[in-house]
Curated annotation (Swiss-Prot):
Pathway in which the depicted protein is active: Purine metabolism; GMP biosynthesis; GMP from XMP (L-Gln route): step 1/1
Known EC number: 6.3.5.2
Residues the record lists as binding ATP: 230-236
Residue ranges constituting the Glutamine amidotransferase type-1 domain according to the UniProt record: 4-202
NCBIfam families per the UniProt record, alphabetical: guaA_Cterm (TIGR00884), guaA_Nterm (TIGR00888), PRK00074.1 (NF000848)
Protein's name in the database: GMP synthase [glutamine-hydrolyzing]
GO molecular function annotation: ATP binding; GMP synthase activity
Species assigned in the record: Paraburkholderia phytofirmans (strain DSM 17436 / LMG 22146 / PsJN)
SUPFAM superfamilies, per the entry: Adenine nucleotide alpha hydrolases-like, Class I glutamine amidotransferase-like, GMP synthetase C-terminal dimerisation domain
GO cellular component, one term: cytosol
Native organism taxonomy: Bacteria, Pseudomonadati, Pseudomonadota, Betaproteobacteria, Burkholderiales
Membrane-spanning ranges: none
Positions in coiled-coil regions: none
Length: 527
């Protein structure tokens, strides 16, 4: 059994980053809503508890509070932003609405010698004060610390920026150690988890494979499992893990909706059927999907049609596998968190997980989610350890509706063919162009890159003739979390090379443009 850190979510947009940072220290962590009951907290038996930030104000009476059981467990507690304010208010301190709000970069002076911040600093002032570069995002602030607490850090506008009760191992930070802008944030969280909580650093993907395989075998027994294989990272890793556990008891259904990347169907079949020996049923449903999409231009309508048709095709194939008792899905931990948090007071409003839908009930199958405890980076690491090609495991995200939302307006087979080839040229070029400074390919230096088909024509000149052909836009972004993103400053030489190749090799396109919009205001995908 792994040591665990319990993270209570008060609605922060970056709560998932806390769990990721803890797991990066090789300690298992889980996120749960702030209002879980006392018996759950006791049964969870955490080595420590972290209270997340959130958008509410503890100065109001009906806003979230920390379960009293947290303070009675006898384990270390770390409150972050709202979590610190709630801790202060509930333990006898005072919190007030701040007249000077702090949003963004701040320099914090560490005070006193506390076990959480001892020896952690970014620079020292001429007066000899240790300083930290941190990220703040708060309006309210603690005016008076509860009994037993000592000042741990301060800023000019926030005299109590951090506090500590060393006897009970309760700590509060007004800044966010989980975001990369807080330079020493990782060191602070590792100090709390490993030294103060004393958690064992034994959460590793190598160990996870053995544990997951044993758990799947115990859960499934001799029964058969079906999995919808999309070719994406999550379903691919789920298939590899399940095959490792139950072999021929697994059958994958790969639905080709005609909106995949160039040669993607062949690559999926080669990897799973030929290389790994997984049983895969390949369904070419492209004609059906394209027929249903004819005349449809609204992006949301296209998504719904593709989603509904996928369910119908998958259901028809799965219905033929009469001995199957389980439906496996590539649900990962962020999907679980988002679905659980939906509708919770104080929580951010996020989509519910689209994978699950109503398929298990419709097919009268039991649901199997072997990756539901893992974050995306952990899923990728697991995939490599299971023998999947790194090029597949580490490739950029691809939307479920595929090229259907990268063809603006109506989806046509000709448009999909043009876009497929243009996109392949762009990706191939990103892989081959190496940045001299880092030694990495531009594909590895970007978080997501793709081509978009624009349903407009422009005048061009090729040879001695006039052309009137379509336009393709290129999009490449860099991001840590996909919540915000910067457009990638690709070398002009690379962009020129891509443009020349697309115009010369993809008949029907005579103009290539590059999208230099960030997120926000633009989204990463165009539709």
């Amino acid at each position: 059994m792994h040591d665990k850190i319990l993270i209570l979510d008060f609605g922060s947009q970056v709560t998932q980053l806390i769990a990721r940072r803890v797991r990066e220290a090789n300690v298992y962590s889980e996120i749960h809503p702030y209002d879980v009951d006392a018996s759950f907290i006791r049964d969870f038996a955490p080595k420590g508890v972290i209270l997340s930030g959130g958008p509410s104000s503890v100065t109001e009476t009906d806003t979230p509070r920390v379960p009293q059981a947290v303070f009675e467990l006898g384990v270390p507690v770390l409150g972050i932003c709202y979590g610190m304010q709630a801790m202060a208010e509930q333990l006898g301190g005072k919190v007030d609405i701040g007249h000077l709000r702090e949003f963004g970069y701040a320099e914090v002076r560490a005070r006193n010698h506390t076990s959480l911040l001892e020896g952690i600093k970014d620079f020292t002032t001429p007066e000899g004060h240790g300083m930290l570069k941190v990220w703040m995002s708060h309006g309210d602030k603690v005016l008076e610390m509860p009994p037993g607490f000592a000042l741990m850090a301060s800023t000019e506008s926030c005299p109590i920026a951090a506090m500590a009760d060393e006897k009970r191992h309760f700590y509060g930070l007004q800044w966010h150690p989980e975001v990369t802008h807080t330079v020493q944030g990782r060191a602070m969280l590792e100090r709390f988890v490993l030294q103060i909580c004393g958690a064992r650093a034994d959460w590793e993907m190598g160990n996870y494979i053995d544990e997951a395989v044993a758990k799947i075998r115990e859960q499934v027994g001799n029964e058969h499992v079906i999995l919808g294989l999309s070719g994406g990272v999550d379903s691919s890793v789920a298939a590899a893990l399940l095959h490792r556990a139950i072999g021929d008891q697994l059958t994958c259904v790969f639905v080709d909706h005609g909106l995949l990347r160039l040669n993607e169907a062949e690559q999926v079949m080669a990897t799973f059927a030929d290389h790994l020996g997984v049983k895969v049923i390949h369904v070419d449903a492209s004609e059906v999907f394209l027929r249903k999409l004819a005349g449809v231009t609204d992006p949301e309508a296209k998504r719904k049609i593709i989603g509904a048709e996928f369910v119908e095709v998958f259901q028809a194939e799965a219905g033929r596998l009469t001995d199957a008792k389980w439906l496996a899905q590539g649900t990962i931990y962020p999907d679980v968190i988002e679905s659980a948090g939906k509708g919770k007071k104080g929580a951010q409003t996020i989509k519910s997980h689209h994978n699950v839908g109503g398929l298990p009930e419709t097919l009268n199958l039991k649901l199997l989610e072997p990756l539901r405890e893992l974050f995306k980076d952990e899923v990728r690491e697991l995939g490599v350890k299971l023998g999947l090609p790194p090029a597949m495991v580490y490739r950029h995200p691809f939307p479920g509706p595929g090229l259907g939302v990268r063809i603006l307006g109506e989806v046509k087979r000709d448009f999909a063919d043009l876009l497929r080839r243009a996109d392949a040229i762009f990706i191939e070029t990103l892989r081959t162009f190496i940045d001299k400074e880092t030694g990495k390919s531009w594909y590895d230096l970007t978080s997501q890159a793709f081509a978009v088909f624009l349903p407009v024509k422009s005048v061009g000149v090729m040879g001695d003739g006039r052309t009137y052909e379509y336009v393709v836009a290129l999009r490449a972004v860099q991001t840590l979390d996909f919540m915000t993103a910067h457009w990638a400053h690709l070398p002009h030489e690379l962009l020129g090379h891509v443009s020349n190749r697309i115009i010369n090799e993809v008949r029907g396109i005579n103009r290539v443009v590059y999208d230099i919009s960030g997120k926000p205001p633009a989204t990463i995908e165009w539709e």
